[in-house]
Amino acid sequence: LDHNNLTRMPGPLPRSLRELHLDHNQISRVPNNALEGLENLTALYLQHNEIQEVGSSMRGLRSLILLDLSYNHLRKVPDGLPSALEQLYLEHNNVYSVPDSYFRGSPKLLYVRLSHNSLTNNGLASNTFNSSSLLELDLSYNQLQKI
């Protein structure tokens, strides 16, 4: 479903779905129930859309390993990341902060890309990225003065 003119999340979607490619569309938001029942979904590609908010729509995605929300208009990081998540791509958005201990619920997280956002030191707590599993953390092109 990538490279279309979709303006909203399609549905209902097959519960057996493992990968969902909705990149390069014009989707502006992900309603809380849009991904309900997709417990087998391992990869969700939503990059290059107009998404401003995802709310808690990711909470039920128990098998999700990869989430790509890069090149959107997000100001906040998604609520309730799935515990199986390994790759989170949020570069080229307008994210200005990451909550304290935000990644604690995702112990398998290996890659976090937050480059080209609006992050400042006030928006990052000192323990935000304290994770022993993290292999790559990209915070380039923000307004950070120290880490």
UniProtKB/Swiss-Prot annotation:
Database matches in InterPro entries: Leu-rich_rpt, Leu-rich_rpt_typical-subtyp, LRR_dom_sf, SLRP
Keywords in alphabetical order: Extracellular matrix, Glycoprotein, Leucine-rich repeat, Proteoglycan, Repeat, Secreted, Sulfation
GO CC term, one of those recorded: extracellular space
Superkingdom: Eukaryota
Main location: secreted
PROSITE patterns: LRR (PS51450)
Pfam family, one: LRR_8
Protein family membership: Belongs to the small leucine-rich proteoglycan (SLRP) family. SLRP class II subfamily.
Protein name stated in the entry: Fibromodulin
Gene expressing this chain: FMOD
